Amino acid sequence: MTIKAVIFDMDGTLVQYDGPFQSSWDAIGYAAGLRAEWDHLMEYYFPKKDLYWEWLDANAQLLKGISVEKVLAKILPPPYTPGVRETIPKLKRKYRLGILTSGLDFIADYICRDLGMDFYLANGLMVRDGVFTGESKKRVYLWTKNQHLRELCQREGLDPREVCFVGDHLNDIPVMKSVGLAIAFAPKDPELIKAAHVYTDDFREIPELIANCSKAVSRSD
């Protein structure tokens, strides 16, 4: 089946913030001056896969009352992965481009507008009168991104077999097993290499990888 869309993980794939997971969540917590508290929550909740929504709420509560503008000024524009700016326009000529992330919608929305990408699905934080309210917007569960991929494909009129997904971490593996073509980018664990059709450490190689893999699939069909 022909690849019609390329969907990217965001944190560690499109952008590389400071922190163990290059995460937009870490970026916003650190920018708010909450590094110690933020890291403590990460250490507690990351192993507890069934408590991800609780983790989001705990992070959101730490930000309650903090100015959104001041925090976003420190993390936008995002630190794009080398090669992103020159590669996305090339991909855009042939494919629809999207983001599926458990990261923050502030960042995903900025990237889509900045690079001309087409759609995204991401988590978020509630804002009122210019400050964080302490509430979260729960849209993408960290460990079940494959379910959210199906939701996103349905929303965008795509068959998952028409999708190339690009991700970097263990929570991306279920998505990789659900799409027509999976690329592990700068994989953080050997299991991603096993799950993906192909892998690379150079973002600029992605268009050629998609083209070559698509030809191989067409021949096998």
Which residues does each predicted region cover?
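Active-site neighborhood of HAD-like aspartate-dependent phosphohydrolases
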Residues: M1-P47
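Glycine-rich phosphate-binding "P-loop"
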Residues: L62-P78, T133-V140
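Surface-exposed amphipathic alpha-helices with a cationic face
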Residues: R85-R93, K145-N146, R150-G157, K177
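Acidic, Mg2+-coordinating phosphoryl-transfer loop and its flanking beta/alpha structural elements
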Residues: L97, T101-S102, P160-D201
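Substrate-recognition "cap/lid" segment bordering the active-site pocket of phosphatases
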Residues: D109-V163, L170
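Short, acidic/turn-prone active-site loops that include or flank metal/cofactor-
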Residues: A122-V127, P187-E191, R204-I206
